[in-house]
């Protein structure tokens, strides 16, 4: 067995692609000082179940305060979502947080589009999300920092099973 293989025959670098760099309970626990300490100036955010539950379009005040605090601290925020629904662009317009939809995570197209929009290098960029197989893996594939948070709401049997496996 070569040095790059795990005991399961999967290359170790592929196994590590599923591990986030940092874990927080909620997105609002991430602080501007933490991001600056790690050289992050662009924070890409998954939308559904990271920022808001699927079941609502109305953010709670702590999220709005967090967004304002990040923006006041000079952290650029951008939603990067796989969603095809209008709720993401609607939120984006209403609360002045830009977005990239149809991002196709774990592919890197949407992530790279957001980075290009703001002129951010991979080492200056992080993506926060609630799903290992889309958000964390997409971040790792793009060469950026991956931050995992607990899913706000598991509303379907499929999501409950998927999060249990993760």
Regions inferred by a protein language model and the residue ranges of each:
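Asp-based, Mg2+/Mn2+-dependent phosphohydrolase catalytic module
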Residues: 2, 7-45, 52, 56-57, ...
């Amino acid at each position: 067995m070569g040095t790059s293989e795990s005991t399961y025959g999967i290359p170790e670098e592929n196994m590590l692609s599923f591990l986030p760099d940092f874990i927080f309970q909620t997105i609002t626990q991430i602080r501007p000082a933490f991001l600056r300490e790690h050289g992050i100036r662009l924070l890409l955010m998954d939308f559904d179940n990271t920022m808001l539950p699927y079941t609502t379009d109305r953010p709670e005040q702590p999220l709005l305060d967090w967004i304002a605090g990040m923006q006041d601290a000079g952290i650029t925020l951008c939603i990067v979502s796989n969603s095809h629904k209008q709720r993401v662009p609607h939120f984006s317009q209403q609360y002045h947080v830009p977005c990239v939809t149809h991002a196709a995570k774990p592919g890197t197209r949407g992530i790279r589009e957001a980075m290009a929009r703001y002129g951010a290098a991979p080492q200056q960029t992080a993506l926060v999300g609630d799903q290992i197989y889309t958000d964390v893996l997409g971040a790792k594939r793009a060469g950026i920092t991956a931050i995992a948070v607990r899913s706000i709401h598991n509303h379907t049997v499929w999501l409950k099973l998927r999060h249990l496996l993760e």
